[in-house]
Curated annotation (Swiss-Prot):
This is Acetyl-coenzyme A carboxylase carboxyl transferase subunit alpha. Gene3D superfamilies: 2-enoyl-CoA Hydratase, Chain A, domain 1. It is an enzyme of class 2 (transferase). Component of the acetyl coenzyme A carboxylase (ACC) complex. First, biotin carboxylase catalyzes the carboxylation of biotin on its carrier protein (BCCP) and then the CO(2) group is transferred by the carboxyltransferase to acetyl-CoA to form malonyl-CoA.
Length: 317
């Protein structure tokens, strides 16, 4: 997969292009030694990357959360779990490809893994409906979660959606009901639930698989009731004010942690999760294992009581 850069990364991209050009020259003529120059440019690129990513604003973080190279749910399943067996369909209407889920092993332990799934090329994007689930997707997720409860398997969810699909067909099939039912049922499941926002956490479409005992976010992910563009269109009648909206919405992991709306922030590799998929998968796996160890120490009654108290603590009176 070729590396893509956002506009604020262009100076980094130019340095990386120079480095690749020098490497190409060396490969074509083995007599030319440009190692020192390549090392100098690599050091310069790394320092520039550190400086750039140390000062990202909320709008830049929002765009990082949507980066076209960013790892998706199936990427994390491949690198964190073993023996993944995908399960399909809601047993009522259809199989929604915007939600993937199934049984897997986490260090040998059976778990149920569920997450939003986007596509990278046009055909796959259409197949996955750009990561926007219809009601049957959320009903599939609930079916798998209820199965996990029956077999006493922890539930691991990965959140990455711009929102639930707002099409007419989805509304006719009960989009709001499907989301509401998931919220209610997840709050009562008797097994540990660990949720992680890996990209976009868009409104009810994210919440429908986001009610958990532990809710974490990757460093450059976002979680909000609406997109910055949508917020700007409502408040200022122009999507061009998206950067301003992002700042006031408090959608970054750091801000949500300050508000005690999430439990932890998983550090990403320098430059974002897509720069080193193995490293971010390792970091996320360690977070999940630590959370699971903590939740395993609780009785079922204590787990449910803690989850209830967590939900009741949200908001202001």
């Amino acid at each position: 997969m070729s590396q893509e850069y956002l506009d604020f990364e262009l100076p980094i991209a130019e340095l990386e292009a120079k480095i690749e050009s020098l490497r190409s020259v060396c490969a074509q003529d083995g007599k030319i030694d440009l190692e020192d120059e390549i090392n100098r440019l690599q050091h310069k690129s790394q320092e520039l990357t550190k400086k750039t990513f140390a000062n990202l604003d909320a709008w830049q973080v929002s765009r990082m959360a949507r980066h076209p190279n960013r790892p998706y749910t199936l990427d994390y399943i491949e690198h964190i779990f073993t023996e993944f067996d995908e399960l399909a369909g809601d047993r009522a209407f259809a199989d929604d490809k915007a939600i993937v889920g199934g049984i897997a092993r986490l260090d040998g332990r059976p778990v149920m893994v569920i997450g939003h799934q986007k596509g990278r090329v046009t055909k796959e994007k259409v197949k996955r409906n750009f990561g926007m689930p219809a009601p049957e997707g959320y009903r599939k997720a609930l079916r798998l979660m209820e199965m996990a409860e029956r077999f006493k398997m922890p539930i691991i969810t990965f959140i990455d959606t711009p929102g639930a699909y707002p099409g007419i067909g989805a509304e006719e099939r009960g989009q709001a009901e499907a989301i509401a039912r998931n919220l209610r049922e997840m709050s009562q499941l008797s097994v540990p639930i660990i949720c992680t926002v890996i990209g976009e956490g868009g409104s009810g479409g994210a919440l429908a698989i986001g009610v958990g005992d532990k809710v974490n976010m990757l460093q450059y992910s976002t979680y909000s009731v609406i997109s910055p563009e949508g917020c700007a269109s409502i408040l200022w009648k122009s999507a061009e004010k998206a950067s301003m909206a992002a700042e006031v919405m408090g959608l970054t992991a750091q801000r949500l942690k300050e508000l005690n709306l999430i439990d932890g922030i998983v550090d990403e590799p320098l430059g974002g999760a897509h720069r080193d998929v193995l490293k971010i998968a390792h970091n996320l796996k360690q977070q999940i294992l630590a959370d699971l160890a903590e939740l395993d120490s609780l009785t079922t009654e204590a787990l449910l009581e803690r989850r209830y108290e967590r939900l009741m603590s949200y908001g202001y009176v």
